[in-house]
Design a protein with these regions (language model features):
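A short SAM/SAH-binding and catalytic strip from SAM-dependent methyltransferases
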Residues: 120-134
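Class I SAM-dependent methyltransferase SAM/SAH-binding core
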Residues: 55-110
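Conserved alpha-helix/loop element of class I SAM-dependent methyltransferases that forms part
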Residues: 26-54
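Short alpha-helix
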Residues: 192-215
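A short glycine-rich, Lys/Arg-flanked "PGG" loop and its adjoining helix->strand segment in the class I
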Residues: 134-149
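Conserved class I S-adenosyl-L-methionine
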Residues: 149-182
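N-terminal, positively charged/glycine-rich alpha-helical extensions of SAM-dependent methyltransferases
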Residues: 1-27
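A short acidic, Gly/Pro-enriched loop at the edge of an enzyme's catalytic core
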Residues: 109-120
Length: 254
């Protein structure tokens, strides 16, 4: 991701954040941590586990809904986001919750925080969708202590291959190439997105001392609703994986 991509995404999210929070804010979990476009409970998926007493960094925290919930569960939570406007929403929610969440205004490709300073780095879509993984993954590895956890959700490469730009929908046929995927630029002034083939993700993790513990291909529960996807797309996601969650461990070998 070039600095121009980071600047473009910052400008886009400063413009989109009010609409995003109005559309999705009430859907995003406020009482317990939930993952992804269908808000599957963390208590069911058990990706992060017990965060009490841990230093936790959220990549692309938006209005900090996740970080607030983790702070309420005893984490020393830090939320990082590229959008100043998102932080206006975050500060309001943090004040309402009465918890301590530190906010850092920066892109996940260049985090102004010291090495080996976190037990957990995680992201629910956010910066692992809108940041270049060739820069965000090394940053996560740099920030983690040995044995630390790196976990994030994002769209599957399969879903990216089935996305139709003209209609802005997910099709039941392959319309984009799988091999070579990396940077996706669609509409002018909209955020740039990123993804990789699965093999490239695994090579990238290994290159930076991250061992894959699990890959969860999320299947929406029957009858699930979403403010992010249509009913037709939810049915698609019950047949094929639309989003997935990687859980990696820093090995201490780097």
């Amino acid at each position: 991701m070039s600095s121009s991509d980071a600047e473009r995404n910052r400008a886009a999210w400063d413009r989109l954040s009010d609409e995003y929070q109005e559309r999705h804010g009430e859907f995003i979990g406020r009482t317990e941590p939930r993952w992804g476009m269908w808000q599957v409970p963390e208590s069911k998926l058990r990706i992060l586990g017990d965060v009490a007493g841990k230093d936790v960094l959220e990549f692309g925290c938006g209005a900090a809904q996740w970080s607030i919930l983790l702070a309420q569960r005893g984490a020393r939570a830090v939320g990082l986001d590229n959008s100043a406007r998102q932080f206006e929403h975050a500060r309001r929610l943090i004040a309402e919750a009465g918890v301590d969440v530190r906010l850092v205004h920066a892109a996940a490709e260049e985090v102004p925080l010291p090495d080996v300073s976190f037990d957990v780095v995680f992201c629910d879509h956010g910066a692992m969708t809108f940041g270049d993984p060739y820069r965000t993954v090394p940053e996560a590895a740099r920030l983690l202590r040995p044995g630390g956890l790196f976990a994030f959700s994002h769209l599957t490469p399969l879903a990216m291959c089935c996305w139709v730009e003209e209609t802005q929908t997910t099709d039941r046929r392959l319309v984009r190439p799988y091999f070579g995927m990396h940077r996706f630029e669609e509409l002018p002034d909209e955020p740039v997105e990123f993804n990789l083939p699965h093999g490239e993700w695994i090579r990238l993790f290994r290159a930076h001392g991250l061992r894959v513990e699990t890959l969860v291909e999320v299947r929406p529960p029957e009858g699930a609703e979403s403010s992010y996807r249509t009913a037709e797309e939810t049915e698609w996601a019950r047949d094929w994986p639309m989003e997935e969650i990687w859980r990696c461990r820093k090995t201490g070998e780097r």
